[in-house]
Structures are given as structure tokens and as C-alpha cells.
Amino acid sequence: MAKYDVLIIGSGLSGLFSALLLAKAGKRVCVLEKNQQYGGNLQTFERNNILFDTGVHYIGGLAEKQVLYEYFNKVGIANKLSLERLDMNGYDRICFADTPALMYPHAQGYENFIQQLLLYFPHEKRALKQYADTMQSVCAQFPLYNLKQGDAKYNTETLSIKLLDFLNSITTDERLKAVLLGSNFLYGQGCYKVL
């Protein structure tokens, strides 16, 4: 008889969360981690006596009925978290070396995101609307984001979209493209190093 029903490789947020869900469903779960500490990108690390705080600094989707709230609620931790909502009009602000005092906001909510950036790019309403609409459409196609019952398959056509090609198709404004890519470093890439 097998000692475990499920083997999970990696103890980042996804691995730990999956293990918890499976254990709550009665499965015997083993989580393997190559590092000395659990947590993946949830942790800090040190090199040459320098501390690198790579852990989670903020996350979205935690308002009631949003995707992470639903996940956290399912495992019984949503109401145990001490959370503080970030600035609705600019949880992130993107700035550039040539205009350091000018900060472009990444606002919460699709419509607010558009409205806040229209203050800086009034000529780009169509592009911003198309960007926000496409974000919503893409997220709705990923099973882990929409929480609806049914096929848990990824849309390969959506996966083939290249972000920079998409941005080039909706605008010629290089500063707007840079602003929209401004938080790309959070995903391990430079501003223009995108697929």
C-alpha cells in the first residue's frame, strides 16, 4: 500500500495550498522541498550577509467574492488574516529616471485602473479599455482564476499571446507601454523583457 496518495514537489504558496486542500479532502500528502526552508517566494534569503526580502509584499483578489478570498475561505483562513487594503487609486506607482517626480498609478479595479491612467494618457482611452477588457477575458479563461465548475483546461490560444505584441497592437505610445509593463519585474522579468 502506498504511503502517500499525493506527492507535491515544491513548498511555495501553491504547493502548500494544494497540500492543505488535498489533506482536507482526506488525502495523505507529502510535500518535498529542495531548500532548507519551506515557503518558496514567501521567504527571505541571505547571500554574503545581505538579506534579500523576496517574500510577498502585497497580493490582490482578497476582497469578498474575489478569487483568493474564495480559496483562502475554502481552507478556513480568510477571516483569520489581518489585511490592509492598499490605495485604491494607486497600489503601485510607476516612475522613470527621466521624470522621477511623475508617478503613474496602477489602480485597483478595472474601471478605476482605466480612469487613473487616463489622467496621464487622455488620448489612450481605447487602448486602456482594450487592455482592461483583455485582462478580464484572459483571467476568465484560466481555471484557477474563475472558480467555475467544468473543464479545467487552459486555452492554448490565450497562452500563445505575446504581451509586447499585444501592447503594440493597441497603442504606439511607448510611455504607456512602459507603464503597463511597469510591474513586470514582480514576475522575474525586466520592463521590456516579455514573451
Question: Language-model segments: which ranges?
Answer:
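Rossmann-like flavin
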Residues: 98-194
